[in-house]
Structure formats: structure tokens, C-alpha cells
């Protein structure tokens, strides 16, 4: 079994889940996040990310989440663009994970009161 977490403001497009489940089936210790596209809140214009614009989660020394470009060493490590990208952290409310692996990691800490903490929790 797998678990998928989505923040309440997330909208999914057709076919978004299958690639995530495929990666978990190949390696149950992989935590997968979909590419996050943007829908403009004024015009509803859909902006999709191509491979060159992809970023990974990172954090500053003040432990605040930030998006960072995929490092060149990580781009070179990958054999093809669809291969998982290693990331120091991730968006905490938008991912899929093997249920047993999530439990092994300790699940979410019930003491966290706000969503901001989840971005760094599994890093």
C-alpha cells in the first residue's frame, strides 16, 4: 500500500499519479513528489514546467524552505530525464510514499501545529 498526501489547494491533472506509484513499486524507499505546475489565481493560466525549469526543495541555514536549481552533478548522474532526482528536502504536503516506509520513518510528528514544519521534517 502507498500513501499520497496533497494539500487542499492542489489540483491534479489526468495521469499524474501513475508515474509516482511506478517509482515506489521499483524502490519502496523512494519518496516521490510530482512536478508542481502553477495555475495563476487571476487568469487561471496554466504554466507547466519543462525539464530545464525543474527545481528541487532546499533550505537555508535559518531552516526556511526554498526552491533551488537541480545541481549539475545530479543532472549528470541521471541516465534519463524521468529518473528520480535526489533532493535535500521536499514540499511537505505533496508526495507519495510506501506506507511501511512512512511508518518506519516515524510518520508525521503529532506535535507539529503548522504545515511549514513538514517541508523540513523528512530531510
Q: Model-flagged regions — what are they?
A:
Residues 11, 15-66:
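Conserved donor NDP-sugar-binding/catalytic core segment of glycosyltransferases
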Residues 3, 7-11:
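The conserved acidic donor/metal-binding loop of glycosyltransferases
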Residues 2-4, 29-31, 94:
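Beta-sheet entry/capping signal
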Residues 1, 26, 107:
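Active-site acidic short loop of glycosyltransferases
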Residues 6, 35, 108:
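Conserved residues at the C-terminal ends of beta-strands
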Residues 64-96:
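A recurrent flexible, glycine/aromatic-enriched loop bordering the glycosyltransferase active site
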Residues 19-20, 89, 93-95, 100-106, ...:
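A short, conserved alpha-helix in the catalytic core of glycosyltransferases
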Amino acid at each position: 500500500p502507498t500513501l499520497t498526501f496533497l494539500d487542499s489547494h492542489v489540483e491534479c491533472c489526468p495521469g499524474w499519479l501513475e508515474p509516482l506509484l511506478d517509482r515506489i513499486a521499483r524502490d519502496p524507499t523512494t519518496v516521490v513528489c510530482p512536478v508542481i505546475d502553477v495555475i495563476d489565481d487571476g487568469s487561471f493560466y496554466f504554466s507547466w514546467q519543462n525539464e530545464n525549469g525543474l527545481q528541487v526543495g532546499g533550505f537555508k541555514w535559518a531552516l526556511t524552505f526554498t526552491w533551488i536549481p537541480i545541481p549539475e552533478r545530479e543532472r549528470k548522474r541521471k541516465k534519463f530525464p524521468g529518473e528520480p532526482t535526489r533532493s535535500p528536502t521536499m514540499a511537505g504536503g505533496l508526495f507519495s510514499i510506501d506506507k511501511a516506509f512512512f511508518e518506519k520513518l516515524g510518520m508525521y510528528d503529532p506535535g507539529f501545529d503548522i504545515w511549514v514544519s513538514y517541508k523540513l521534517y523528512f530531510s
